[in-house]
């Protein structure tokens, strides 16, 4: 048994699944099924551990695609149980005919509590911070906008197992502002914000706000480049060096709490805007469409995840915000998602701000 457990769980499960079902379109050319001559023995092991169920094939593909490896029989059983619950959630949600679809992703073997601990980190009351200072002009706001088409939106990043979403929202806004101002791209240090911005009421891997990060950068004199101060995804001591500054902040502009008209004006005419919203349990499996929810809140105390609004539009008669996430390019729609516009859905316009670079 110990020899078998040292094998990747994905190999064990895919071997079993390939033999167990022909009607699901399993790729017969997959070389993984040739790993061992002891196919029947491996099948017996998997069945002994997990039992025969309709979820085994899906779990096998999941473990293989995301390189999941489990350290013991007990852990495999636990993760399979969690996976089944999440798969049932995805399937039941997709049957409701909603404006969005869910799909299995790298989070499918995590409980909701684990996911919250690893990925969310903007759960603070921002009402005292965000007194609106954005000025609406008479300029015509475009019907649709996608700042990616202007080439100023930096690539999607991955925050890892650290509640540092607020740092990625911050750097995303600054990278876009820098590119817009100076005509070239830049990658900025999230890790400096994790390590150094605590005096401005931020808490590293345990949360923070872009508006407070902008203030830190302004008074600190700048933010280092990613190359000079690379991301580790862990809290650490501050290693800021003024000689490695990539950008400086002259000021930051806040959107009035809940004012989607102001937010649309800013996103449409100025540049991408840092926003925060409440992630509810089904959102982590978002794949495409316009996300909407009747369970999320929209108060300053509800928001728990900071992201970057890079545009807006309409899909199947549903207006939406186009938003860049920090969960990697494989998540969602190539790292992006759409959130319903016009209802301050999940608080998307509750904590919004953007920087002015020097």
Curated annotation (Swiss-Prot):
Signal peptide: 1-21
Listed name of the protein: Thiol protease aleurain-like
Residues of this chain annotated as glycosylated in UniProt: 125, 254
Positions of the pro-segment in this chain: 22-140
Keyword tags: Disulfide bond, Glycoprotein, Hydrolase, Protease, Signal, Thiol protease, Vacuole, Zymogen
Function recorded in the entry: May play a role in proteolysis leading to mobilization of nitrogen during senescence and starvation.
SUPFAM superfamilies: Cysteine proteinases
Biological process terms in GO annotation: proteolysis
Entries under InterPro entries matching the protein: Papain-like_cys_pep_sf, Pept_asp_AS, Pept_cys_AS, Pept_his_AS, Peptidase_C1A, Peptidase_C1A_C, Peptidase_C1A_papain-like, Prot_inhib_I29
Disulfide bond sites: 162-205, 196-238, 296-346
């Amino acid at each position: 048994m110990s020899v078998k457990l040292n094998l990747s769980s994905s190999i064990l499960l895919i071997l079993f699944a390939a033999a167990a079902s022909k009607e699901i379109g399993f790729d017969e050319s997959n070389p993984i099924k040739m790993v061992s001559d002891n196919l029947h023995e491996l099948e017996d092991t998997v069945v002994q551990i997990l039992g025969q169920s309709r979820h085994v094939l899906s779990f096998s593909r999941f473990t293989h695609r995301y390189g999941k490896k489990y350290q013991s029989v007990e852990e495999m059983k636990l993760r399979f149980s969690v996976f089944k619950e999440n798969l049932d959630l995805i399937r039941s949600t997709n049957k409701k005919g909603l404006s969005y679809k869910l799909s299995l992703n790298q989070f499918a073997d995590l409980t909701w509590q684990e996911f919250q601990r690893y990925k969310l980190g903007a759960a603070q009351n921002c009402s005292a911070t965000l007194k609106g200072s954005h000025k609406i002009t008479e300029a015509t706001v475009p019907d649709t906008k996608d700042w990616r088409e202007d080439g100023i939106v930096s690539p999607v990043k991955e925050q890892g197992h650290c509640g540092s979403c607020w740092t990625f929202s911050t750097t995303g806004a600054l990278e876009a502002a820098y590119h817009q101002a100076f005509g070239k791209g830049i990658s900025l240090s999230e890790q400096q914000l994790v390590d150094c911005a605590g005096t401005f009421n931020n808490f590293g891997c345990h949360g923070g706000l872009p508006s407070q990060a902008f203030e830190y950068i302004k008074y600190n004199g700048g933010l280092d480049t990613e190359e000079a101060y690379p991301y580790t995804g862990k809290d650490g001591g501050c290693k800021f060096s003024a000689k490695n500054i990539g950008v400086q902040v002259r000021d930051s502009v806040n959107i009035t709490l809940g004012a989607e008209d102001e937010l649309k004006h800013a996103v449409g005419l100025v540049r991408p805007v840092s926003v925060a919203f409440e992630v509810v349990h089904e959102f982590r499996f978002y794949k495409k469409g316009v996300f909407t929810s009747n369970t999320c809140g929209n108060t300053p105390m509800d928001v728990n995840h900071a992201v970057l609004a890079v545009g807006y539009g309409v899909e199947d008669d549903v207006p939406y915000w186009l938003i860049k996430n920090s969960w990697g390019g494989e998540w969602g729609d190539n790292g992006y998602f759409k959130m319903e516009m016009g209802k301050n859905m999940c608080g998307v316009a509750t904590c919004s701000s953007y920087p002015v670079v020097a």
